[in-house]
């Protein structure tokens, strides 16, 4: 089941995120956030979804502000993470599809994904949803003894209008 995340989901989300932070360059964080910090992130995101098997969170995806300055408010940065045993199962596709549908319905115009490279699985996933590579920052992050590039992918969610639409608030709903 896919549903809106709540602050109470922070521990389940951290169970997925902590090993990614500790053991991979996928996230450029050097230390995992605390449960309280993760709960605050969930509360302030534009959209945050979790996918469960039974009552166990096996993945999450969120749309965060692309940048803090006001003119960027119609663009979101998308991130998706799955538990090791959920990868390759199609759950990531379902989760990303729901997230993109939700932010599009709310009025966002662009979605961006920053991907630490190399990461062929993430690149294939985002490109299969119509994201196109628009930039690459070389040697932008140093983690685990090596320099890493970040590629940026973009998908237009709707045609831009002038003036742009208002962004509708996040609504707590249970999805597919």
Please place each PLM-identified region on the residue numbering.
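Acetyl-CoA-dependent GNAT
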Residues: 30-85, 96-97, 102, 156-158
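Conserved GNAT-fold acetyl-CoA-binding loop/helix
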Residues: 14-40
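Conserved catalytic-core motifs of GNAT/GCN5-like acyltransferases
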Residues: 62, 112-115, 127, 132-149, ...
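A short beta-loop-alpha structural element at the N-terminal edge
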Residues: 1-13
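Acidic/histidine-enriched, glycine/proline-rich intrinsically disordered or flexible terminal extensions
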Residues: 158-176
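Conserved acetyl-CoA-binding loop-helix of GNAT-fold acetyltransferases
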Residues: 88-101, 121-128
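Conserved GNAT acetyl-CoA-binding A-motif
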Residues: 103-115
């Amino acid at each position: 089941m896919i549903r809106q995340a709540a602050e109470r989901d922070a521990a389940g989300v951290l169970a997925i995120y902590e090993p990614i932070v500790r053991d991979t360059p996928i996230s450029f964080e050097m230390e995992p956030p605390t449960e309280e910090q993760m709960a605050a992130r969930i509360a302030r995101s534009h959209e945050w979804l979790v996918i469960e098997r039974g009552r166990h969170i096996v993945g999450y995806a969120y749309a965060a502000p692309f940048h803090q300055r006001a003119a960027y408010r119609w663009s979101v940065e998308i991130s998706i993470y799955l538990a090791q045993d959920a990868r390759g199962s199609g759950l990531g596709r379902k989760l990303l599809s729901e997230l993109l549908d939700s932010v599009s319905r709310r009025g966002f115009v662009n979605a961006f994904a920053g991907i630490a490279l190399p990461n062929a699985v993430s690149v294939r996933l985002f490109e299969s949803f119509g994201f196109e590579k628009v930039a690459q920052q070389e040697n932008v992050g140093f983690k685990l003894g090596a320099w890493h590039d970040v590629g940026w992918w973009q998908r237009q969610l709707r045609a831009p209008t002038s003036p742009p639409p208002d962004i509708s608030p996040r609504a707590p709903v249970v999805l597919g």
